[in-house]
Amino acid sequence: RDAGVNALAPGELLRAIRIPADRLRRRTAFRRISLSPMGRTGALAIGTLTPGGGLDLTVSGGVRRPVRIAFPTLPTPQEAAQAVDAAIPAETWFDDLHGAPAWRRAVTLDFAAEIAAELGEPAE
């Protein structure tokens, strides 16, 4: 589905979201950027380590809908960036006053690499 489209019928309400407790205990890394300090998100990436040592990486903000990439093992920073680049077609990036597609793509690829590197370090 594209932005602004959901599965709710007219008059239906979302009353609850259930998140398994084990998901809330995972190690995470988060990156967000906008063109102004309090501006609309230009790019956003969230990574979580899976119990089996993999990485779930979700990209949002700069694309028409969230994109989730599941790595069975922790990727290198370069592998994470390459996987994001391969998973998101050029026409999927937003092109508006909050950021050009090339900028959104570039910072998102940097975020993917940073997240893989951060989560690859030992926990404090």
Whereabouts are the PLM-identified features?
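C-terminal structural segment of proteins
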Residues: 1-124
